[in-house]
Every structure is written in structure tokens, then in C-alpha cells.
Amino acid sequence: MLEPRPRVFFLFVSCLDDLIGTDHEALLSALGARHPEIAFRMCHMNPISLGSRTPPPVSIQNNLYSLLAPSEKRDEGINAIGNLEPTAVTSELYHFLSAYGVSRLRHISQYETLNAYQEMAGSRANLVIGAPGRQAAGQMEERLGIPWIFMPVTYDMEEIEDNYRRLKAFLFPDREEACDWGPARERALQAIRRAVKKAGRFPIIIDASAASQPFGMAKALLTYGFSVVRVEAQDCMAFDKPHMEWLREHHPEVELHQPEHHRAVLFDRRMENSLAIGVEGAYLAGSRHVADLFNDSGMFGFDGVCRLMRLIEEAAEQETDLGQLINGYGLVV
């Protein structure tokens, strides 16, 4: 018997359980009846469901936020949903929220107990930064009455400004403008100029493990003066499709590949002199220079542009031990 007693118990099952028809609802019902003090949740680590409405990343988000109970209290806090890591404290997003009186941008990683976690149920709105959190946010709106807005990470300066206008209209429609984006925008422009000067000579490869909008990142970097030559993405999310179409129209020379295509194992697309953003594209190309970014970690707004530029500069300055990087991620290749 576990001591102290857990409040929540997540059961992870593989595709085998789904294929043999395991009755998970019956299992959850039996466990709940035997241990009513514990909330049981079933998570499916099933690659077969990747093309379904609830692939594993979405299912996990749904289960996590289903633990929040309706709250009688409502404060000015905002929840960040879907992003695996909290937005970096250097982001101007905090300055934006603070200018309108919001002192807390809550993220699930900030909580150590279930009781403390319930604080998120009292927030006034959900900012969905990671796409897998959209379904959970919709469920939270139905159960908890928390409205939400989807704003995936972008590295395009114009899109960033537009996102902040959308966010202001969503959160504070009746308030006067309280933020000056000039300084944050100028910092991003300076970071871009430095990075282009240092890394502009490298052919750049972008993959979907690094960013939720790899085609959008490619568009932004090409606009800034970088030499993007390849995008590796198994699928293109609907919100990233306009960027992919832009690439096809304006830069048809950029290669678009699927990393899980059966020909990928031939390794006939090696480009060792490239600078890869993301470990998947780096592995397939054998890149000697790698900007180690995973899932837009901590990125948002103009600060996200600055941080991406620093990663590119650092990658240009030194070669990467690709084997060590892959082992560090615990990837199976």
C-alpha cells in the first residue's frame, strides 16, 4: 500500500490493450468503487491513434485538466494550457498581462499538490499555447465556464503583433491600450540581425519536433534573410497550412519531407554542413550544427524570437555531438 495515499492515479496502456479490446471503463469503474478517495484516469500511449481526434498528447491533456473541479471563486489569473513548459520569465507576455492588472500566468508545472492545482479552476481565461490543449480547453469551458483563445507560438513579427492585438481584444476589450511593444520588437530585430550575420551562411533545416508551426518558422526565417533549405514534418497542422502554401508559392526550392516516410531509412538526404533546428531533422541530415529546441520550449512573442536567434547563434558557433544529443533525449533510432 502506497504511503502517503495518492490522490490521483494515471494508468498508461499501450496499443496492445486497445487491439485486444480491454474494457478500460469497466476497469476504471471497479477501481473507483474500491478506492473512492482516488481519481483514476486512463491514458492511451497508442501510435495508431495519432490520426484520430484524441491522439496521446491530446488525451493526456484532457485527463490532466479533467481533475479540476468547478470553483466558486474567479480571479484575474490566466492559465497557459497545452505548452509542456511554462513561458520563459523573460517574455514580454508577463509585462503585457501585468499592464492590465493580471499578476499570475498559471501553468500546471507550478503545482505540487492536487489541492493547490485547483487554483487553475478559478482563473478567468485560458491561453492555449500548445495545440494538444485545445480540446481540454473546450471541455474546461463547458465544465468550468473558463473561456479560451488559441495562440500557437509564432516567430513571425507581424503575427506576434497581431496575436497581442487578438489577446487584448479577448481579455480586455473595453480597456485602453496599456502596452508599448516598441522596445520588445526592437530587441527582436537586433537579435535577428546578429543571428543572420553569424549564421546566414548555413543551410537551415527545420523539423516539427522543434516547433508546432515548422512551416511558419521557415517562412519567418526566410523573410529575415536565413537560408532555409528543408522542412521535415510528418503532417501539417491546419493552422500551419497557410505557411506551407506560402513556401510552395514563394520558395518552391525548399524541400518538404516526411521523417517517417519509408525512404527516410535510406539516409540519402545527408547534409552535414547544415544547421538543424530540432533533433529529428538533424539526425536525418547528419547535421554538425544543431539548435536544440523541442516543442517551442518556453517560447512566446518577441522574446521567443530573441531566444530562437540565440539558439541559432550558439549552434553556428560550435559543432554538436549528435549521438550525445539523441541519447540525452532518450530517443530510439
Pin down the residues of each PLM region.
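An N-terminal assembly and electron-transfer interface module characteristic of large anaerobic redox
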Residues: M1-V333
